[in-house]
């Protein structure tokens, strides 16, 4: 179907990506997404997810915390609300749009341990992002783990691989079971 849409000009294909080629078609697509209730959720999710990425890159931890709390409170069943697996599921949800610009790896071997999330930028100009999650610990402890375990080594490649010189943003995210609050801290590594 996508191939036919490219052939007929409804979509364009460049650098391994399919996109809507002109503003008129994009506006029609936006209208359809906003009018079609079943797609409206996807549209809102994509917008919030993009807002989360932009807040992360801007180190706007207040906006990050608001988005995390809203997603956690509206998307997670109350019985598993305090589960670290659910926090990870919320991270997948709020960072959904990051996959357009980054290759996302979970529980990846990095430095002296396993990093919760690592975002490898597709564009060499974009920074790399390392996320570490903690439940009932501070976000500073998560960030300290990123630094202490040298997770940024993952961006330097293995022996014999080409090293990258990306800027790397470390992000510590925590959830407190008692207060039901999320906290975030960021630091350029």
Regions found by a protein language model. Give the residues of each.
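Extended alpha-helical interface modules used as scaffolds for assembling large macromolecular complexes
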Residues: 1-144, 148-150, 180-189
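Short catalytic/binding micro-motifs of nucleotide second-messenger systems
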Residues: 151-159
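Domain-level recognition of nuclease-like catalytic cores that cleave nucleotide substrates
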Residues: 158, 162-189
């Amino acid at each position: 179907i996508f191939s036919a849409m490219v052939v007929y000009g409804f979509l364009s294909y460049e650098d391994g990506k399919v996109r809507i080629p002109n503003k008129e078609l994009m506006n029609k697509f936006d209208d359809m997404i906003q009018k079609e209730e079943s797609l409206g959720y996807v549209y809102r999710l994509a917008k919030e997810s993009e807002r989360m990425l932009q807040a992360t890159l801007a180190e706007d931890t207040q906006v990050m915390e608001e988005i995390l709390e809203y997603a956690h409170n509206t998307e997670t069943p109350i019985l598993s609300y305090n589960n670290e697996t659910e926090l990870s599921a919320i991270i997948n949800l709020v960072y959904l749009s990051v996959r357009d610009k980054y290759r996302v790896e979970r529980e990846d071997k990095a430095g002296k341990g396993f990093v919760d999330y690592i975002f490898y930028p597709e564009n060499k100009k974009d920074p790399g992002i390392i996320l570490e999650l903690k439940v009932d610990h501070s976000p500073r402890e998560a960030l300290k783990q990123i630094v202490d375990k040298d997770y940024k080594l993952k961006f330097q490649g293995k022996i014999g691989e080409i090293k990258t010189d990306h800027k790397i943003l470390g992000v510590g995210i925590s959830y407190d079971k008692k207060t039901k609050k999320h906290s975030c801290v960021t630091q350029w590594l």
